[in-house]
Amino acid sequence: MTLNPSTLNNGTLGDLKEHKDVVLSSNAQTDEKRFEEPSLEVGGSLAKVENGLSTSISSSASNLEGQQAPFFTKQNSCLSRFRELAQTYNIHEINLEEYVSQIKEVKQSLYSDDSVFNESKSSSPPDAHTDKYFTPCGSPTKLIHSTLLEERDTPSSLEHVSFYLQESAVSEVRFDKPSNNGPLGRSSLNLSSLSHELQTSQDSPSLSATNQLSSSDTLEPLQYPPSSFGSQRQFNASQDSPKRSPSKGSWSSILRRPSLTYSPKRQSTGLHRRSLTNYFKFPHRNAHQHNAIAHNPSVFGKPIGDLTSDPTNLCKFTFPTPECAPPSLLLPHIFAQCVHFLSLNALHVPGIFRISGSGPVIKAITEYFYSPPHFWLDETSEIFKRIGFPSYIDIAAVLKRYIMLLPGGLFTHKDILNLLVPLYVDSSRVKVPIDIRNEMAALCFSQIDSYVRFSILCSLLALLHQIATRTQELENGMENTKDSTLMKPEALGIIFGPLLLGNSSTDLSKSCPSGNVNDLMRFETEKARVEAKIVEGLIIHWPEVLLKINSLDIPNCFSDVGLTDQVAIFTPAVPKEDSPEQIPENVNASEESYPNVKHISKLPLINDSSDNESGNQENDDAVANESTKVVVDNQQPQPKISTVSDTAVPSMSFANNISSRSVISAATDSKPSTRTSPPFVNNTKPIVAKSPVTVTASSETNKKSQKINKKASPRVSLWTKLFGKFRSNKKKS
């Protein structure tokens, strides 16, 4: 169908629209007829592909389930055995959150006996605070409830803290108790709107009421008190307020201070003085830091997830002391290198795993470490030459960083940690025998997700047990162990206790029953204490736990245990350090090893003509050669030896030259037994010594010549110039 221009000119706009609709409908019908049969064919092929994929996936899944079925059944049998033992010995399953929340802390205040807070004992504080004191922003003292209940209150949830810490020291904002919707209040808090309200409320207090939060929010409207310097009653109870204590800069404040050591702080103006380092601190750098590190390919040479999943990054590792770990472990290369090196060399190092190593060295190891044969041998040799070779502390820091960045930590999930809680708390130690507790701990290890993680945990506990044993041996030989910095099981438990779960998303602090900041801090402290106690118990009783692991055949509970026969065997690598050339200790001072010795052939000549010196030049040369050999043998071997010229050394005077000659002759005569004749020397004429009379005469002449030189010296001190005439007149009188 075509359009006629005459009809287009004579027609209307409605006719044109109708014609357009007809053309589009006809084109659509032709397209449907054209692609009708191919679409059916494509649809049939897609359906066939989908059916094939589904059947292949289902078959592979069934095969995988069939292969992993025996491992799952063994894990379930270990778990059922654990519950049977718990029921037999009346061990109740205690959750870590429940156990920590039930602990009653003894709350003490530093100002409990102060007379200022006697009034607060009668008044009842709000429900969110049980310490009977409030701590406002910018003041370190405790303020009583009776005077500041209407003006100030501490935040009652974590959501309030972010805004509470950003406010200035002058503006005082009150956070009321949250509603019953939840302990943490709102899920999100708009800090920008609240900061805008804080800025506009001081100029127009009436506008603050209109800009309050809606009724759906859990927070009640904020109340802004008057200025900090407006009312005296507001700071009546504060010990650091300018109303009670004078200013620090005035002279009269020294006399009016209650004590010499009292120095009150000035009231903050609310203005933060910026420094140069503030402009280089960006908040987006630290956002999601642990997640970015876990997926960063520059950490440990490869992504840390690939180090535990890729078989090319794993090796079959045997612990240096086989009785401390299972026979064959499956470890990443870098972890195996660190464990092997520390187990052989660093058991006695004080503060190991506690002291942080060198940052550049640790970064070089974590960034440039690859699978063999490259690690520490090729790529990083030039780097270590510039920044220094790793020490024991650096390698221990690399091992600790690996565990910190490992997703899920050592246990993967908190259910395994909850199984170990009733075994190492104080109330259950009396009830459960040691043998049963070790067996139950070994059964808990069977619930780990992979054999690689199980190998990491076993090798780490074996290393920590070796360090604790070596520490005990060294401290037994010490008289005073109070100042010892060696690592005991308690210290190692404090370090590795929080690393049981790592930086996993299932953090136990999120399940705190209360949103109060003080309660959360106590919760985290108690949680770390329980975790440290668990690690400490595992370190102390690790040999017994290992016996139970081997007897129960725990390694066969993991489906990836077969990879130990497919990966490469561990080969230890040592940093390639270019040590300087060392000269052997027992080296004969010959002319071949020391070519410069031939220049030290003669002593300085003496201009003394006597009857005994004729024909003795050969003997003097022989004595000189023998003396130089003895001196060289007694000294440390050095690559370079200074030479002495053959020319005669000019003497200061003839008397001094004679005295030196006499001293040499006296030394030879005084100890004739110690002096041995040099071998392989043709002694035709014996050496004749000087007489004792000559020695005394030469010494007397030497003294006289020294006195003459002193008297004839032109040096005159300033004292003699000023007071010499006075002293001479005094002698004459």
Swiss-Prot record:
This is Probable Rho-GTPase-activating protein 6. Residues 179-195 have a biased composition (Low complexity). InterPro entries: Rho_GTPase_activation_prot, RhoGAP_dom. One of its GO terms (molecular function) is GTPase activator activity. Residues 312-546 form the Rho-GAP domain. The lineage of its organism: Eukaryota, Fungi, Dikarya, Ascomycota, Taphrinomycotina. The record marks R354 as: Arginine finger. Residues 116-125, 196-218, 225-240 have a biased composition (Polar residues). One of its GO terms (biological process) is small GTPase-mediated signal transduction. Signal peptide: none annotated. Gene3D superfamilies: Rho GTPase activation protein. Residues 704-713 have a biased composition (Basic residues). The modification Phosphothreonine is found at T141. It comes from Schizosaccharomyces pombe (strain 972 / ATCC 24843) (Fission yeast). GO terms for cellular component: cell division site; cytoplasm; lateral cell cortex; non-growing cell tip. Residues 116-135, 174-256, 692-713 are annotated as: Disordered. Keywords: GTPase activation, Phosphoprotein.
